[in-house]
Amino acid sequence: MSEKYSVIQVGLGPMGKIVAKLFLKRKNIHLRSVVDIDPNLREKELNSILNIEEGSKISVEPELEIALSKYKADVVFIATSSSLGKVAPLIQQAIKSGSNVVSLCEELSYPFQNYPKLSGELDALAKSKNVSVVGTGINPGYLMDLLPIVITAPCQRVEYIKVTRMINSAKRREPFQRKIGTGLTPQEFHEKLNKKVITGHVGLIQSIQMIDEALGFKCDKIKEYPSKEIISEKDFTSSYGEFVPKGYVCGLQSKALAKKDGKERIFLEFIAYADNPEEYDSIIIEGIPRIYQKIIGGVHGDLGTAAIVVNLIPKVVNARSGLLTMKDLPVPCYTENILKHY
């Protein structure tokens, strides 16, 4: 016998809405309920929120507990925060109900070094309920960690890995452009970064930690540098209608590295700014053989993130129990034709 995978979604922000639309399109997914704390969404039907025809029977609940009392979910998908501390109570609630968990929380993509105690608790709880928990996304979760890990498979030896993600941020949604500082003065950029009003890119450390563990480098120094603003050389108007004068911030550069015995082994670089003339994702493996992969045009972040989440549903359900990372799951791939068997 086979049937669709049942899913409850928590979080209907800009990225959550994109994922919800894809859930509704997938023939192997049954989106049972959506949860969001926004009072303006209370008891509204999902189709009106997403401005689509599908999903008319799905209403928005204010709490996960209510949704779980109504429906049994194979997977609870959480898209609420980058902070694991904030997301952990929802994860625990989902696990206790017997549901697997997939989350876009960047800190969950590799939480073991930054949250050792909490990671141990989540792992033990998930194993006690025979479910799995994973943090994912296009980045962290795939392009700058899992993909370079997999690309090393045909290498006899690996000395050094460099990954670069180059983005034209003008093509991305408004919250992304704002979190990388678009439209700020250089002084405002640094003040807001320091006060965590804007986050810049989150996840380079987690990506390095995942690569380091997968390849067994055992790096003794991992460092993320402060994000550096990129200044616009001309006046422009953002995709959401804000005028940005010449000399103001139009994006940022973030980078992180890992060393072993003073030798650099991993270098990650994330560059995103408006009207970037070249978009790509590149991976260089210095080893035997040397490998250079470049995805011309890059992978669209929002489309890719939604696809990663939705394609992961069958993989997570069939994975071993516990707190996992993307490298621990069955090989990720397109899964629309995969149904649940019982």
Go through each PLM region and give its residues.
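Rossmann-fold NAD(P)-binding glycine/threonine-rich loop
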Residues: 106-131
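N-terminal Rossmann-like dinucleotide-binding module
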Residues: 1-51
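Conserved N-terminal Rossmann-fold NAD(P) cofactor-binding segment
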Residues: 38-71
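C-terminal helical cap and adjacent loop that interface with cofactors, partners, or active-site loops
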Residues: 273-342
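Active-site-lining helix/loop region of Rossmann-like oxidoreductase modules
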Residues: 6, 10, 14, 152-279, ...
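Short, ordered loop/turn segments at secondary-structure junctions
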Residues: 37-39, 81, 105-109, 138-139, ...
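General beta-strand structural signal in soluble alpha/beta enzymes
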Residues: 103, 133-136, 162-163
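Rossmann-fold NAD(P) dinucleotide-binding segment
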Residues: 66-75, 84-106
